Amino acid sequence: MPASILIADDYDDNRELLRLMLETEGYHIREARNGHEALDAAMAEVPAAALIDLSMPSLDGWGLLRALRADSRTRSIPCVAVTAFAATQDRQRALEAGFDAYISKPFRAKELLELVSGILRKGAGEDAHKDGDGR
């Protein structure tokens, strides 16, 4: 079964681009237009990973991350900050806030796919270790 990826971004074009890039690799995609929709989607069906735009209206990416990390069901979802902010301090702030990875727009499909593949492998390794199967 393909891994489920949640994309949270308020711009339709951004969600479509991310979806197309990820679907070519066989990922199952769920989309949300804002942080509230993304939180509801994650609670209904916990995704293998989430790509989160930091600058969404209503509940932004920072608030969404805090909400996901506060709930035991969604706490361990690997979360990637997706943003137009490319400064080193922006990346550092996102990682310190609890994002597992950071990617700035614009990016290449290969860069995104390698990042997603890496966080899914890392997440699978941590899950196996938590279940007692990791050695």
Report residues per predicted region:
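Charged docking surfaces used in two-component/phosphorelay signaling
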Residues: E16-T24
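Short hydrophobic/Thr-rich beta-strand motif most characteristic of the beta2 strand and flanking loop
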Residues: G26-R33, A41-A42
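Active-site beta3 strand of CheY-like receiver
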Residues: E45-L51
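Receiver (REC) domain active-site loop signature in two-component systems and cognate sites
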Residues: M56
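C-terminal output helix
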Residues: F107-V116
